[in-house]
């Protein structure tokens, strides 16, 4: 299935009306720059499971996530999948040094992105140092998340990994949805396992164990933190 594409018209005001305007890559632009910026992008809608881009593809576009969650992953030589991250609204994808994507991305549920062709986007930022600074900020944030993931994959128990994942995911959602003890988990248990370097059976047992100990409640589409302090102590172990 091909994604449906909606071109951004110059008078559509898609950027100024964007729900993530204040946190997106374009947040550093003024009103006049934003109107020019609208000409560069197009909105693309992906259904659940559709590929946004594939590892080793030549990078021809940048992607600003507007709605939904994306799964970012690499395939190992033996066919196993290692999930390297999950992209949320406001995340900016496509930055790399090699000119090729170094991971694949597909949609978890419905996803909408703002897609920018690489060459005109590059020309646009050359005259706008504030936009380049914003891109650098996003790149530093991505690097920080990658380092956190490396620590998560290190010498930690399954309980510690799952607890740290839940708190880290909750923290990322905080900026989008505000504080809440309910943590939506749009990804599958298999996705979480592939992110943490565990088996799906271990992840499922750990969720059940945390619920049995009164730390969380497993609800439809996610979990509820019943005892955040207990989960925080476990994640910090």
From Swiss-Prot:
DNA-binding region: 189-208
Transmembrane spans: none
Induction comment: Its expression is maximal under reduced oxygen conditions and depends on the two-component regulatory system FixLJ.
GO cellular component: cytosol
Keyword Endoplasmic reticulum: no
Entries under SUPFAM superfamilies matching the protein: cAMP-binding domain-like, Winged helix' DNA-binding domain
An MF annotation (GO) of this entry: DNA binding
PROSITE patterns according to UniProt: CNMP_BINDING_3, HTH_CRP_1, HTH_CRP_2
Keyword annotations of the record: Activator, DNA-binding, Nitrogen fixation, Transcription, Transcription regulation
Role description: B.japonicum has two FixLJ-dependent FixK homologs that are activators of the transcription of a group of genes involved in anaerobic processes such as denitrification and possibly nitrogen fixation. FixK may bind DNA at the FNR consensus binding site.
The name this protein goes by in its record: Nitrogen fixation regulation protein FixK
Native species: Bradyrhizobium diazoefficiens (strain JCM 10833 / BCRC 13528 / IAM 13628 / NBRC 14792 / USDA 110)
Lineage of origin: Bacteria, Pseudomonadati, Pseudomonadota, Alphaproteobacteria, Hyphomicrobiales
Gene: fixK
């Amino acid at each position: 299935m091909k994604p449906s594409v909606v071109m951004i018209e110059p008078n559509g005001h898609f950027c100024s009306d964007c729900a993530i305007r204040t946190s997106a890559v374009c947040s550093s632009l003024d009103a006049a720059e934003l109107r020019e910026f609208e000409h560069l992008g197009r909105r693309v809608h992906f259904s659940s499971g559709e590929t946004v881009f594939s590892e080793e593809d030549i990078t021809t576009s940048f992607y600003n996530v507007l709605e939904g969650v994306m799964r970012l992953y690499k395939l190992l030589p033996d066919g196993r999948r290692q999930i390297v991250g999950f992209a949320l609204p406001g995340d900016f994808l496509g930055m790399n040094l090699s000119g090729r994507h170094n991971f694949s991305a597909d949609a978890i549920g419905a996803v909408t992105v703002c897609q920018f062709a690489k060459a005109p986007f590059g020309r646009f930022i050359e005259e706008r140092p504030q936009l380049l600074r914003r891109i650098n900020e996003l790149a530093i944030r991505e690097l920080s998340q990658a380092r956190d993931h490396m620590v998560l994959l290190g010498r930690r128990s399954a309980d510690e990994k799952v607890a740290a994942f839940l708190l880290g995911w909750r923290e990322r959602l905080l900026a989008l949805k505000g504080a809440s003890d309910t943590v939506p988990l749009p990804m599958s248990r298999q996705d979480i396992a592939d992110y943490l370097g565990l088996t799906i059976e271990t992840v499922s047992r750990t969720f059940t164990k945390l619920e049995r100990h009164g730390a969380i409640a497993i609800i439809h589409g996610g979990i509820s933190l019943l005892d955040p302090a207990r989960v925080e102590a476990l994640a910090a172990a």
